[in-house]
C-alpha cells in the first residue's frame, strides 16, 4: 500500500495564531494526531457547535471519536496537567480519552521542582523578565539536554526513579536556596506526586515512533500539531524572548520519531494581523485605538495565562522568515473577520535598519529586531462582514485583494481562510491532505 500523505501544522508568527481550530478541522481526515514539541504552556482553543474546549497537552484531534492521539518525545509532559486535562475531557463526555492517547516513553516529565525553579528565576529577573508562563517548561528542557531528566518510562520503575530523583534534587535545591532565596523541594513530596500519577500514566506509555510509522505504512494520514510559533523558536526566534523548544516544521520529525520524508505538506497558520504575548521586540505593534480594537474584537487574551496579547499590523517581512525556515507549502489565514471595519490597512513589507539600510526579511535575534523600523504598504479595508463566510467568492473585494497581496509579498499561497472560531467557519482553496 502506498504511504499516506501527512501534514504538519505550525504557527508562523509569535504563537496564538489559531492552530487548535485548524488541527481539529483537519483531524476529520487523519488516522492520528501528534504533538511533537512544547509543553502545557500554551492552550489550543477549539469551538465545536458553539462549545469551547481548551487543550494544552493533548492533541486537538481528541474530540474526534475513535481518533488516536500521540504525544511524541519532543514534548515535556506534566503528569498532573495531563491527567487534569483528561479529567476535564471525561467530564465533558469525550469518549475513551485514555484508551486513545499514547505517550512516548522518552518524554521528559515536568515535576514540582521544575515549576519551583522556573518561578523563582522569573521573580529574580525583575525588569528583565522573559515572560515565561512559570509552568516548568524551560527547566524540564534543560534537564533533557543535561541528561538528568526523569522520563515517562521511569514511571514504570519506581525503585530506580527514587535514586534519580535524589540526584536531581541535590542540583535543584542548591539553586533554589542559595541563588534565589527560595525553599527546597522535598523528595517525599515529589514521590507522592509520582505515586499518585504513575498508575494512570503507565498504561498510556507506548512506542509512539513505531506506531506512527506503522500507521503510515498502512495508508493512514498523520497530522503533526505544533505549539507556540516559529518566531518563538529557540534557535530562529527573537532570542532570548523565545520558548525552550524548536517550534519549526522540521522538529516534527525528531519530536515524533518519524523520518523527514514523511512530512509531505507544511501548513503555516497566520493571523490576519500580528500578535505577541509577553516580552520581546514587535516591530509593527500598535499603541492606538486600532490596536485596541483588534485586541477587543479578536479576544486577544491567552487561553492558558489570561495575559493580554499585544496587537499590531500584519508583518509580511516576519512571515517571510517563517516561510523560509519551515518550508511552508501553504498558509491558513485566521481571524480575517477581526479586520472587518478597519478603514485603512497597513502591511509591513520590510524594515529600515540603522545606518540607512533596508531588509525585506526579519533579522535573527532580538537585538537586531529591536532596531527595525517597519516599512508599510497601505491598502483600503472593507466594511462588509466576513464572519462565518464559507466561500472565497463571497468575500468582499478588498478582503480578497488583502489576501492576494499577502501571497505576493510573502511568496506562499493561501490554502485556507478562517472566518470564525467554529470548525465550520472555514474557506478551503487547497486542502492540505489533497
From Swiss-Prot:
Annotated Mg(2+) binding sites: 16, 43
Cofactor dependence: Mg(2+)
Any GO CC annotation of this UniProt entry: cytoplasm
CDD domains in the record: AdSS
Coiled coil: none
A Pfam cross-reference name: Adenylsucc_synt
Major location category of this protein: cytoplasm
Entry's family note: Belongs to the adenylosuccinate synthetase family.
Assembly and oligomerization: Homodimer.
Function, as annotated: Plays an important role in the de novo pathway of purine nucleotide biosynthesis. Catalyzes the first committed step in the biosynthesis of AMP from IMP.
UniProt protein name: Adenylosuccinate synthetase
Amino acid at each position: 500500500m502506498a504511504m499516506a500523505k501527512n501534514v504538519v501544522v505550525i504557527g508562523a508568527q509569535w504563537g496564538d495564531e489559531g492552530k487548535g481550530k485548524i488541527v481539529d478541522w483537519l483531524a476529520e481526515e487523519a488516522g492520528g494526531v501528534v504533538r511533537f514539541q512544547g509543553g502545557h504552556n500554551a492552550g489550543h482553543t477549539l469551538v465545536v457547535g458553539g462549545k469551547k474546549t481548551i487543550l494544552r497537552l493533548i492533541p486537538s484531534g481528541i474530540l474526534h471519536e475513535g481518533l488516536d492521539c500521540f504525544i511524541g518525545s519532543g514534548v515535556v509532559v506534566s503528569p498532573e496537567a495531563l491527567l487534569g486535562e483528561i479529567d476535564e475531557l471525561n467530564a465533558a463526555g469525550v469518549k475513551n480519552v485514555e484508551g486513545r492517547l499514547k505517550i512516548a516513553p522518552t518524554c521528559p516529565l515536568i515535576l514540582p521542582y521544575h515549576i519551583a525553579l522556573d518561578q523563582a528565576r522569573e521573580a529574580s529577573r525583575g525588569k528583565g523578565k522573559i515572560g515565561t508562563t512559570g509552568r516548568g517548561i524551560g527547566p524540564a528542557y534543560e534537564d533533557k539536554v543535561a541528561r538528568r531528566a526523569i522520563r515517562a518510562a521511569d514511571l514504570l520503575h519506581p525503585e530506580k526513579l527514587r535514586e534519580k530523583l535524589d540526584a536531581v534534587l541535590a542540583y535543584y535545591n542548591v539553586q533554589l536556596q542559595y541563588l534565589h532565596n527560595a525553599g527546597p523541594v522535598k523528595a517525599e513530596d515529589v514521590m507522592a506526586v509520582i505515586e499518585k500519577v504513575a498508575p494512570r500514566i503507565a498504561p498510556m506509555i507506548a512506542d509512539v515512533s513505531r506506531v506512527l510509522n506503522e500507521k503510515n505504512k498502512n495508508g493512514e494520514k498523520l497530522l503533526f500539531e505544533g505549539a507556540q510559533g516559529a518566531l518563538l523558536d529557540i534557535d530562529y526566534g527573537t532570542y532570548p524572548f523565545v520558548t525552550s523548544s524548536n517550534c519549526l516544521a522540521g522538529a516534527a520529525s525528531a519530536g515524533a520519531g518519524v523520518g523527514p520524508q514523511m512530512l509531505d505538506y507544511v501548513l503555516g497558520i497566520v493571523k490576519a494581523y500580528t500578535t505577541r504575548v509577553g516580552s520581546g521586540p514587535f516591530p509593527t505593534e500598535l499603541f492606538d485605538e486600532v490596536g485596541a480594537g483588534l485586541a477587543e474584537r479578536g479576544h486577544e487574551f491567552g487561553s492558558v495565562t489570561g495575559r493580554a496579547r499585544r496587537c499590531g499590523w500584519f508583518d509580511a517581512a516576519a512571515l517571510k522568515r517563517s516561510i523560509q525556515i519551515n518550508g511552508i507549502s501553504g498558509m491558513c489565514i485566521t481571524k480575517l473577520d477581526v479586520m472587518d471595519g478597519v478603514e485603512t490597512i497597513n502591511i509591513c513589507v520590510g524594515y529600515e535598519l540603522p545606518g540607512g539600510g533596508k531588509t525585506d526579511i526579519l533579522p535573527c535575534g532580538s537585538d537586531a529586531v529591536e532596531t527595525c523600523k517597519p516599512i508599510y504598504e497601505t491598502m483600503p479595508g472593507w466594511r462588509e462582514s466576513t464572519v462565518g463566510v464559507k466561500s472565497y467568492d463571497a468575500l468582499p473585494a478588498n478582503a480578497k485583494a488583502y489576501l492576494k497581496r499577502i501571497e505576493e509579498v510573502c511568496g506562499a499561497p493561501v490554502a485556507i481562510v478562517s472566518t470564525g472560531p467554529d470548525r465550520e467557519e472555514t474557506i478551503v482553496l487547497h486542502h492540505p491532505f489533497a
